[in-house]
Regions:
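Membrane-embedded alpha-helical segments of integral membrane proteins
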Residues: 15-64
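Terminal targeting segments of Actinobacterial cell-envelope proteins
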Residues: 1-12
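Internal/C-terminal transmembrane anchor helices
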Residues: 71-94
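Hydrophobic alpha-helical transmembrane segments in integral membrane proteins
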Residues: 88-106
Length: 481
């Protein structure tokens, strides 16, 4: 074979390879651009348009270079680079979408369980040995009925339910020997534990039914303002678990005026509890035991606003977030030693790592104003986190932050909305002005609790003037004042 024939054959081979690479490049480009525009990525300073033009321009250039049969080596190099860049970008975008999807994955439901329990030393070890149970059918009728229906369907077992005023009262009756078996709703267990820290070792569960509660879809945002409910639950483990909410902060955001207002409603605020609370008055933290919807509706009713989205994190995720941000800096206006971790917090600017931050936001017994001071400390840490999250450096590391939190934070904010916020921040630059406020009231020990009717609990009776002031401040930010 002559040298010219070899060159001709090599040239044809290169052209075929180039056409193949161009097809792969085009396919990757179509998927990449589809995702970029579907999820509104890079939509600041026309960067998404610039990326599109560059991708299309390279495809057109390579097409004509292949047709011309010239500079074949250069064409191959350009196509290989293009395929590599598109493939890597598509993988990164896919990973990012996967991470954010997992943030939303459990946002439409919450998990809890209903059980039949007996004393740990009871000879009863199977549901077939039980004929009657005690439980609060007056306050948790629907969940108890679901358990009874499941027992009938799966075990062909019908039980007589003796009425108790609460799960705590049922547990006390079990300890006293007045009943042999009780019903337990997992979301009420930490209420029992607050009075009987060793209760878990005193009982054994002989039957459990896992249940799921559906959460409402997000409310549409109109204009530049919206509200986010930030809930901190008082448990470790899966974020989808139903639990009391010890942190209740409404973040009011106005993108036009670049203002953020953080409103803390103390956990002990005495308010009508929506949904499962039947609009009966109780401390706000107990709304969380009926699901995140109950907390949202309770606060919406209290302040007369819509909460468009929610972000729910447990103390496990709180630790992760602080670690991912490299700690936070806050000003501490009173020295104290935390009961939870024994750490000392001096007056002045302090840098908090994850464990120190957790102690800082959980402490209330060593603070002059108790739970209200704790709420203010929570606001300080939230502000510090927001300032870091809205910094350019944090936005560059957005994917790693989301990856680290994907299993410990729950939000119903769609990816498109998240990207709109990121794009708006990158487009306009600057920083948000963050202010905070907290609802005030008077502490009392004589107010009845719907969830714990036998207990004498600390409640905060809300000040009417403080409530009106808080409402006005939220509306001012919403209206751009």
């Amino acid at each position: 074979m002559s040298r010219s024939s070899k060159r001709a054959r090599q040239g044809k081979t290169k052209i075929l390879i180039s056409w193949g690479l161009l097809a792969i490049y085009a396919l990757l480009a179509v998927f990449l651009l589809f995702l970029i525009f579907k999820y509104n990525m890079l939509a600041f300073r026309y960067l998404n348009i610039v990326v599109t033009v560059l991708i299309v321009a390279l495809a057109i250039l390579c097409f004509f270079l292949i047709r011309s049969k010239k500079v074949q080596n250069l064409t191959l190099i350009l196509l290989l680079l293009g395929v590599l860049i598109n493939g890597t970008s598509l993988f990164a975008v896919g990973q990012f979408i996967g991470f954010t999807s997992r943030l939303n994955a459990t946002s439409n439901y919450s998990n809890y369980s209903m059980s039949v329990a007996v004393l740990a030393d009871s000879p009863i070890d199977n549901i077939s040995q039980v004929t009657s149970v005690m439980g609060p059918t007056g306050t948790d009728k629907d969940n108890i009925q679901q358990l009874m229906n499941d027992l009938k369907a799966s075990q062909n077992k019908e039980l007589t339910v003796e009425e108790s005023s609460s799960y705590l009262a049922a547990y006390k009756s079990l300890l006293a020997g007045d009943t042999k078996a009780i019903i337990l709703n997992s979301v009420f267990e930490n209420i029992i534990e607050s009075e009987y820290p060793d209760y878990a070792s005193k009982i054994k569960k002989i039957y459990t039914k896992e249940l799921t509660k559906t959460v409402e879809t997000p409310k549409d945002v109109k204009g530049d303002s919206f509200n986010v409910y930030i809930s901190g639950i008082d448990t470790y483990g899966p974020i989808s678990s139903v639990s009391r909410s010890d942190v209740n902060i409404i973040m009011t955001v106005n993108r036009e005026t670049k203002k953020i207002l953080l409103t803390t409603t103390p956990r002990d605020s005495y308010v009508p509890i929506a949904d499962g609370g039947n609009n009966q008055k109780d401390k706000l933290t107990h709304a969380g035991i009926y699901g995140v919807d109950a907390s949202i509706h309770t606060l919406e009713n209290l302040y007369g606003i819509d909460l468009n989205y929610y972000a729910r994190l447990n103390f496990t995720s709180f630790l992760k977030l602080i670690d991912l941000l490299g700690g936070v800096d806050v000003y501490n206006d009173q020295e104290f030693t935390a009961h939870t971790n024994g750490k000392f917090y001096p007056v002045g600017n302090v840098h908090l790592d994850s464990e120190q931050a957790l102690g800082f936001v959980r402490e209330r017994y060593s603070l002059a104003d108790g739970d209200r001071d704790r709420g203010r400390n929570q606001q300080k840490v939230i502000v510090a986190i927001l300032q870091k999250l809205t910094s350019t450096e944090a936005l560059k590391n957005y994917d790693s932050i989301i990856k680290g939190l994907q299993d410990s934070i729950q939000t119903n904010m769609p990816l498109e909305t998240m990207m709109n916020l990121v794009n708006a921040q990158l487009e306009s630059g600057g920083t948000y002005k963050i202010n905070s406020q907290d609802l005030k009231g008077t502490g009392r020990m004589d107010l009845p609790s719907y969830a714990m009717p036998e207990s004498s609990l600390y409640m905060m009776e809300i000040s009417d003037s403080s409530l009106e002031s808080v409402k006005a401040a939220i509306n001012d930010v919403m209206e751009g004042k």
